[in-house]
């Protein structure tokens, strides 16, 4: 934290309020889960913290008088913009509560294969206007900050973390490998590839044809697990793949840990949209105890295994599948890379969260 920032006066009462844009994705990971921990944060007896999340806007200005920040998460429509205008004109003249725009995704220039592209393309100007009215912004990555700097000049970064109180301890699969078929996992939403029902006439996505063919041909050799969604190209072998449908985000950690994957893969196309993503999959794969194989894109610069082509990813899958010691070394290297970032509850990550919000306005905890 910048030494020129001013410490808040004690005793202090900090209030965090968030209007959620979603309650199952980044709204949970970046707002609901850390807000649960904020209520338990105690660095000193002289600091009290309250936090609250809402889905429906409250128009009465008096409601906001006890809050230090009002966060709007993933606001993207004309309706949201009108709420910003109301807050600026009706609330801020009475109470000095800044608007902080929280965002974990690139909402501009979304690839055609991503079914969200239609929604955000038509609302792109409202996204920019909401950012322009914000008193500050929080992004999940430095690259995302760089992209949005055109629309807001007061942006800080809070990386993603996982809640250990939900994920629990790590039990690496290589520690109890039983010699059975190797389990390989992919998890994610349908945004990673085109769907004929959602994006008619559009093809492509994060899975290349050679990787898809490899998966198709190795369903007898490996146990493939897809969690959340699955490419249409794999439908001919769907009965040989274990597919787990979408999971509630609070149940997702238990579901993927129960699989006990030996290897987890994160193929991503190298494009500006994916360059803005966080390393959330690297955190999740580490928390699962799996050896991770990633595409060589910006979010995974710290990973031990990064691949540039389908052929390279296939080669690494085969190498790790045949060598438990290689899986162990891969996991240990990746765990070392993300250890300080991994859990909200460790490495002062909750305190850093608070200080990042205060730092937007040149303040900090004592």
PLM region spans:
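Active-site proximal beta-strand in glycosyltransferases
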Residues: 70, 91-110
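Donor nucleotide-sugar binding/catalytic pocket of nucleotide-sugar-dependent glycosyltransferases
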Residues: 132-170
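N-terminal pre-catalytic "stem/leader" segment of glycosyltransferase-like enzymes
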Residues: 1-78, 306
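A charged, aromatic-enriched C-terminal amphipathic alpha-helix characteristic of glycosyltransferases
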Residues: 324-362
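Membrane-proximal helix-turn-helix segments that form the acceptor-binding/catalytic region
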Residues: 89-90, 118-137
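Conserved catalytic-core segment of nucleotide-activated headgroup transferases in glycan assembly
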Residues: 17-36, 161-255, 259
């Amino acid at each position: 934290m910048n030494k020129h920032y001013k410490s808040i006066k004690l005793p202090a009462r900090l209030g965090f309020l968030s209007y959620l844009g979603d309650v199952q994705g980044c709204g949970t990971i970046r707002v609901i889960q850390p807000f649960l921990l904020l209520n338990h944060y105690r660095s000193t007896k002289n600091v009290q913290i309250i936090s609250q999340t809402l889905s429906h806007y409250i128009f009465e200005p008096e409601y906001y008088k006890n809050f230090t920040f009002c966060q709007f998460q993933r606001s993207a429509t004309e309706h949201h913009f009108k709420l910003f205008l109301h807050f600026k004109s009706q609330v801020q003249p009475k109470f000095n509560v800044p608007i902080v725009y929280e965002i974990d995704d690139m909402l501009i220039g979304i690839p055609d294969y991503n079914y969200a592209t239609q929604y955000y393309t038509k609302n792109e100007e409202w996204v920019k206007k909401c950012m322009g009215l914000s008193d500050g912004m929080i992004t999940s990555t430095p690259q995302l900050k760089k992209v949005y700097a055109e629309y807001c000049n007061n942006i800080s970064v809070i990386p993603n973390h996982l809640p250990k109180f939900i994920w629990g301890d790590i039990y690496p699969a290589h520690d109890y490998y039983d010699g059975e078929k190797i389990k390989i996992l992919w998890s994610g939403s349908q945004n990673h590839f085109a769907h004929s029902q959602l994006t008619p006439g559009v093809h492509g996505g994060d899975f290349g044809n050679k990787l898809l063919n490899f998966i198709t041909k190795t369903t007898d050799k490996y146990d493939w697990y897809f969690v959340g969604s699955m490419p249409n190209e794999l439908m001919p072998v769907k009965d040989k793949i274990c597919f787990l449908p979408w999971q509630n985000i609070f149940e997702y950690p238990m579901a993927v840990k129960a699989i006990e994957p030996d290897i987890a893969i994160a193929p991503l196309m190298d494009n500006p949209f994916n360059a803005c993503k966080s390393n959330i999959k690297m955190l999740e794969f580490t928390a699962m105890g799996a050896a991770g194989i990633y595409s060589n894109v910006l979010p995974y610069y710290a990973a031990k295994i990064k691949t540039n082509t389908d052929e390279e990813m296939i080669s690494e899958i085969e190498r790790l599948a045949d060598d438990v010691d290689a899986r162990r070394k891969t996991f240990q290297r990746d765990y070392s890379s993300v250890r300080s970032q991994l859990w909200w509850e460790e490495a002062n990550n909750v305190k850093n969260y608070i200080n990042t919000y205060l730092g937007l306005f040149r303040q900090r905890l004592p």
